Amino acid sequence: MQETRVLVETGRTTGEETMSYWFDLPIDVAEFEEKLGVGAESRDYRIIEKVLPFADEVHEHTSVYQLNEFDFMYRQLVADMQEEYPMLLTVFENLEALYICRNVITVYPDCKNMIDVARQKLMNDPIFKHLSEDCQEYYFDFEAYASHLQEYGKFLVTEHGIFELPE
């Protein structure tokens, strides 16, 4: 799991010093308020550094509650989606859009091309269960089926596998 933490600085000063602390996500609100001396709902703090896979979603005035929500959404993604998160963002608008669609995305982690996906679908799809092993091995045209899938489906090919995306 990738490290998720932020450096938060108070807008107020205690004496001459501005207070800042690193917090691991999800942030415990009571600990946050105790360490910084400001309410989690206040505008008296800002995020000055971040180590997050979803860093583009977070800006200086993102609230603790929003940070925790982003962290929750990211952690709900399967490991393959987390690993390929930057590539998935080329298709999805943001983390929330990916999170909403996460259960309808099919991951083919061991597939390097569409023929591999065609083979995987043949093995796992109940539509093909009536085909004999001989038929599957000797007569099934995987290249044609792969072309059909690519033409009529939506797929994202990555370094670590292929994702079948919703239309």
Per-range role (PLM):
Residues M1-S42:
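N-terminal ordered "arm"
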Residues K35-P126:
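Mixed-charge (acidic/basic) macromolecular-recognition segments
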Residues R119-E167:
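Acidic, proline/glycine-rich low-complexity IDRs
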Residues E9-G15, L52, E159-H160, P166-E167:
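Short, flexible beta-strand-to-coil junctions
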Residues V6, Y21, Y45, L156, ...:
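A broad, low-specificity signal marking well-ordered, structured residues that form hydrophobic/aromatic
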Residues T14, V29-E33, P53, A146, ...:
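A generic structural micro-environment signature
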